Amino acid sequence: MSAKTEEILESLKSLSLLEASELVKQIEEAFGVSAAASAGVVMAAPGAAGGDADGGAAEEKTEFDVVLESFDAAAKIKVLKVVRNATGLGLGDAKALVESAPKTVKEGIAKADAESLKKEIEEAGGKVTLK
């Protein structure tokens, strides 16, 4: 790699996501290309090679919202305890959140944390979706 390309690469590494997004838009306008078209081709190739077993990279989100859809009336207290522990809300606020289902319990959390919270709520008697 030439010194010039290494310098450009190092500059790109220091960009924030917002700056990188703006840069992509400027490159698209300057060169009359579309990054979305080339990204689609790149994303399709691994999916085709893998046999589409797991749905591909379309589900590769990094942040998830945990939404309490409903709960078993008999398990309300158990669900309330899990929600309260997960959110740090007081008893009244957690109760209001649970009773107003469907309602978002936590927003923008990592996939592993979201799946763990989903499992906890479901074990307590709630129905949860990840968005």
Curated annotation (Swiss-Prot):
NCBIfam families: L12. It comes from the Bacteria. One of its GO terms (cellular component) is cytosolic large ribosomal subunit. One of its GO terms (biological process) is translation. Forms part of the ribosomal stalk which helps the ribosome interact with GTP-bound translation factors. Is thus essential for accurate translation. SUPFAM superfamilies: ClpS-like, Ribosomal protein L7/12, oligomerisation (N-terminal) domain. This is Large ribosomal subunit protein bL12. Keywords: Ribonucleoprotein, Ribosomal protein. Homodimer. Part of the ribosomal stalk of the 50S ribosomal subunit. Forms a multimeric L10(L12)X complex, where L10 forms an elongated spine to which 2 to 4 L12 dimers bind in a sequential fashion. Binds GTP-bound translation factors. Pfam families: Ribosomal_L12, Ribosomal_L12_N.
